[in-house]
Amino acid sequence: MAKKDKKPKVNTIVTKDGESLKVFEDLNDFEMFIKNETEDEEFDHIHCKLTYYPPFVLHESHDDPEKIKDTNNSHNKKFVRHLHQHVEKHLLKDIKEALHKPELKFHDKSKDETFEHIVWHYGEETEYHDRKFRIQVTVTCNHDDAMVDVDYKTIPL
């Protein structure tokens, strides 16, 4: 019996600007990448994306993406409320822990809402190992499915 390959599901894309962008499909792989980059002293210049089904959606569908209800999208108030709670209580908390910055507050918060999607923006300036940088996290949910996009970027100051 062969062992299942547990390598992270990640693709590296080069943008039009020549920037290298890592795209993840798994929340745990995304968080592990941020943690590893922090430990490797590469924490202040990262850009990566995560596209995933939130854990509460998968739990509701018994971990079967085929059984996810079509109504789980940005037009569903319950879905939006649960997604916002997931982002605030789990995703951002896990990012803080990966950065070894549990006191991080993400003071720069905003929300953009259109018919097509809802976007939450989180930003904060911080310092780690005497290096100042800005963290930007953008979370987007769309009107047509339960898939969520997270854009994580750190910029040296």
From Swiss-Prot:
Gene3D superfamilies, sorted: Respiratory growth induced protein 1
Keyword Cell cycle listed: no
Domain of life: Eukaryota
Keywords, comma-separated and alphabetical: Cell membrane, Membrane
One GO cellular component, as annotated: plasma membrane
The keyword Lipid metabolism is annotated on this UniProt entry: no
Primary residence: membrane
Compartment(s) where it occurs, according to its Swiss-Prot or TrEMBL record: Cell membrane
Alphabetized InterPro entries for the sequence: RGI1, RGI1_sf
Membrane topology: Peripheral membrane protein
GO biological process terms on file: energy reserve metabolic process
Annotated family: Belongs to the RGI1 family.
Role summary: Involved in the control of energetic metabolism and significantly contribute to cell fitness, especially under respiratory growth conditions.
Name of this protein: Respiratory growth induced protein 1
